[in-house]
Curated annotation (Swiss-Prot):
<keyword id="KW-0143">Chaperone</keyword>
<dbReference type="GO" id="GO:0003755">
    <property type="term" value="F:peptidyl-prolyl cis-trans isomerase activity"/>
</dbReference>
<dbReference type="InterPro" id="IPR037041">
    <property type="entry name" value="Trigger_fac_C_sf"/>
</dbReference>
<dbReference type="Pfam" id="PF05698">
    <property type="entry name" value="Trigger_C"/>
</dbReference>
<dbReference type="GO" id="GO:0005737">
    <property type="term" value="C:cytoplasm"/>
</dbReference>
<dbReference type="GO" id="GO:0043022">
    <property type="term" value="F:ribosome binding"/>
</dbReference>
<keyword id="KW-0413">Isomerase</keyword>
<dbReference type="InterPro" id="IPR027304">
    <property type="entry name" value="Trigger_fact/SurA_dom_sf"/>
</dbReference>
<comment type="function">
    <text>Involved in protein export. Acts as a chaperone by maintaining the newly synthesized protein in an open conformation. Functions as a peptidyl-prolyl cis-trans isomerase.</text>
</comment>
<keyword id="KW-0132">Cell division</keyword>
<keyword id="KW-0131">Cell cycle</keyword>
<feature type="domain" description="PPIase FKBP-type">
    <location>
        <begin position="160"/>
        <end position="240"/>
    </location>
</feature>
<dbReference type="InterPro" id="IPR008881">
    <property type="entry name" value="Trigger_fac_ribosome-bd_bac"/>
</dbReference>
<dbReference type="InterPro" id="IPR008880">
    <property type="entry name" value="Trigger_fac_C"/>
</dbReference>
<protein>
    <recommendedName>
        <fullName>Trigger factor</fullName>
        <ecNumber>5.2.1.8</ecNumber>
    </recommendedName>
</protein>
<dbReference type="GO" id="GO:0015031">
    <property type="term" value="P:protein transport"/>
</dbReference>
<keyword id="KW-0697">Rotamase</keyword>
Length: 426
């Protein structure tokens, strides 16, 4: 067997394998014999078709099958011997039987060779959130909204109120357009942007007022729309007082006292924003390393991440895109993002290799112990059995390895903590 490896690019190679008849003929003869036993040709008993006729009829398909099997057999051995690191399935580009030899040409993508930059000089800022009483109050207010009551208000509409009115579309002269009236339309001012023309027109108005609203086109050359709103009612969300009885109801008897409930809210907020702080830091780290290592990405790897992003988007809309949605266009639009994912995978694999990182069963046990502290209803043994199962083990190993990779990076870069206020949210 002879082999010739040609570098096509940083991420692509071609392999030429030349086999002697002694190396491929046994497989060819076996395929021919199996075909002779099964092929039916009119005028001949099954299994008694002359070999010459059989070669003329199905010879090309046998040659293709033999080339496929020989390529698979020898590529695996050559890849191990030459330390080839394929990034895609090998494809047969051509094969040729001539002068007692079988020549097979194979193409495939490889992981690129590159050097990691010294990232010890990199600096990152990590948000450090401190939960204040005001943050707890704001979170509790959001919870109480689910237990509030909408009541009619005589006051002028303010942020957070709901305005109910009849809406009529107007023509360019300000006259009602027949059939355009929409009765009892609800405007929840809280969820309208501050610059929304309806919110701007309705805030400060009371029941009985009539307001005209002009909605200008977002794009040049678009149509300007005009509406008249006859306000019939302003409703305000009245929140209940937080007391021990309501705490029992809200927490489903987990807590009996307001103080205990508030403390739990504080702990939840602290855990949430600690996770957010860590997530944002890791995102900043990966973005920096991707930027500093413009590594070429194998197309098969990029396509893999494009498919993942496509399936994730599909799950977010219930498992099926709406009718008329162009999946191919979306797939192509995901390519830049997929390239970043592929590049980060190559970089993180390089870090793991250079630092001899691996995941042991002891690592998985330690991970189970840590997770059990977060979920008291599950024991370490229960989690460990799940993590070591066929369905979950690869995922858990990948998760732990990622943690180790980031730990290596964090140990070498400079991370500065920065006091950061908790962002308001609705």
């Amino acid at each position: 067997m002879q082999k010739n490896i040609t570098n096509v690019s940083e991420i692509a190679q071609e392999l030429e394998i030349i086999l002697t008849a002694e190396e491929y003929q046994p497989e060819y003869d076996q395929q021919l014999e199996e075909a002779r036993k099964s092929v039916r040709i009119k005028g001949f008993r099954q299994g008694h078709v002359p070999v010459g006729m059989l070669k003329r009829i199905i010879g090309p398909s046998i040659e293709a099958e033999v080339a496929e099997k020989m390529a698979s057999k020898y590529f695996a051995a050559i890849a191990e011997e030459e330390k080839i690191n394929p990034a895609s399935r090998a494809q047969i580009e051509s094969y040729n039987y001539e002068d007692g030899k079988l020549t097979i040409k194979i193409s495939y993508e490889i992981h690129p060779e590159f050097e990691l930059k010294d990232f010890s000089e990199y600096t990152f800022t990590q948000a450090e959130y401190t939960i204040s009483d005001e943050d707890v109050d704001r979170e509790i207010k959001l919870i109480l909204r689910g237990h509030g009551t909408m009541v009619t208000s005589e006051d002028a509409a303010a942020e957070g109120d709901t305005v109910i009115g009849d809406v009529t579309k107007l023509d360019a002269d300000g006259a009602d357009i027949e059939g355009s009236k929409n009765e009892n339309h609800h405007f929840n001012l809280e969820y309208l942007p501050a610059d929304n023309p309806f919110r701007m027109a309705l805030e400060g108005k009371k029941a009985g007022d009539v307001v005209d609203v002009t909605v200008k086109p977002k794009e040049e050359g678009g149509e300007t729309n005009r509406f008249r709103i006859e306000i019939k009612e302003v409703k305000h969300l009245e929140l209940p007082e937080l007391d021990d009885e309501l705490v029992k109801e809200i927490s489903q008897q987990r807590f009996e006292k307001v103080e205990d409930f508030r403390n739990d809210i504080r702990l939840q907020l602290q855990a949430h924003f600690s996770d957010k702080s860590e997530y944002d830091l890791l995102e900043a780290i990966s973005s920096k390393l991707i930027e500093e290592h413009p590594v070429p990405t194998p197309s098969a790897m990029v396509a893999h991440f494009q498919n993942i992003l496509l399936e994730n988007a599909k799950r977010q809309v219930g498992g099926q895109f709406p009718k008329g949605f162009d999946e191919r266009e979306f797939f192509n639009a995901m390519k830049p993002n997929a390239e970043k994912h592929a590049r980060w995978l190559l970089i993180s694999q390089k870090i793991a290799k250079e630092n001899n990182l691996e995941v042991t069963d002891e690592d998985i046990k330690a991970f189970a112990e840590k997770e059990a502290e977060k979920e008291p209803s599950l024991t370490v043994d229960q989690l460990l059995n799940t993590y070591l199962s066929t369905e979950f083990k690869d995922y858990i190993i990948d998760t732990i390895l990622k943690e180790k990779i980031y730990d290596v990076i964090k140990s070498k870069v400079t991370i500065t903590k920065e006091a950061t206020p908790v962002p308001a949210h609705n």
